[in-house]
Amino acid sequence: QPAILRQRRAFLALTGRLALAAGCAPLSWAAGANPRIKAPKKKLLLDTDIGSDIDDAVALAYIVMQPDIDLLGITTATGESVKRAALARQITRQVGLDIPVIPGLEAPRVIAQRQLVAQQAIELPQTVRQTLPRDHNPEAAIDFMVDTIRSNPGEVTLLAVGPFTNIARLLERAPGISKLLHEIVIMGGKYSDYPTPWGPTEWNAIVDPHATSMLFQLAECPIRAIGLDITWRLFMTPEKVRSEFKTHPLLQTVLAWSEVWFKERDLLHFHDPLAAACIVSPDLCTYSQGTVQVDLSNSKTAGITTFTPDPSGLVQIAIDVDPDRFFSTFFTAFSVAART
């Protein structure tokens, strides 16, 4: 048997040299070269304000159903972050996923809170609501992020789909920690004149504008920003949502929560789900590379984002999306899960 192994190694070495001489990729037994061996899952930390816009819950449902994602933990931000963590925990427990879900910071760094409550918490079971702690240590969420990133250097993608209060605190408290990240992906900002109801503003960016500014100033890793000007193109009517979300038990849970949302809205936009899907399938969007500046000059414009093209910049902003491919990618995750 050792002789056979030596012969195989000699054969591989010879074919490798011949392949290189011919300008081809050499044969290999490495995992990445064997089409039957799947690439490792993408390690993910999720920071979310689940409990307000329904798309956070939709994104989390997609993430836990996506076979190519290894969700390491969840942190929550803005008002009633304990209730937001409880909502996230309802989804993870429904699929048997036992991971840390930790409430983080609530108050913006400078301005007054604009997102005080988690409206969808009304859908929490009464037994859960009665046992929620009244107080929490928000720094525990930051501790968890720091420890997880340091334990997985270069492997973790940080997905931020709420106001960036926790992310700014992470970068402030652990200088250089972003160098250990694979990348940061955000749903936030608006980077073009594409028409939306709020002009140049976007909610995640303006709720804590100083945190938004710190994110773009302090991060030392690649950032992919999926802005409102892109996500606004992806939407469904309540009737379409009710029809499509009947197909999977987890989507049925989210559908029940969405009824709170649809009392005040006539569409579901897939803001956060697009950011999540772009982690697995980056080519759902096309991008432009550069830098992002955040306006802090006055209260009316605070949080408005401006993109400047720069080939040396760390930021890639989405500039276009394929809606059909997105919805196919999104619902495929649930149909595959239903068959397994």
PLM feature spans:
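Conformational coupling and interaction surfaces
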Residues: P40-K41, Y62-M65, D70, W203-H210, ...
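Metal-dependent C-N hydrolase catalytic cores
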Residues: P40-L44, K83-S151, G313-D322, F326-S335
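Short, well-ordered secondary-structure micro-motifs
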Residues: A112-Q115, T196-P197, F235-P238
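N-terminal export leaders
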Residues: R8-C24
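Short, mixed-charge aromatic SLiMs
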Residues: S81-L87, V110, K190-Y194, Q293-P309
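C-terminal segment of N-terminal export signals and the immediately downstream linker at the start
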Residues: P26-K43
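Active-site histidine-anchored catalytic micro-motif
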Residues: A39-I50, I54-A86, Q90, T131-T231
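N-terminal secretory signal peptides
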Residues: Q1-Q7
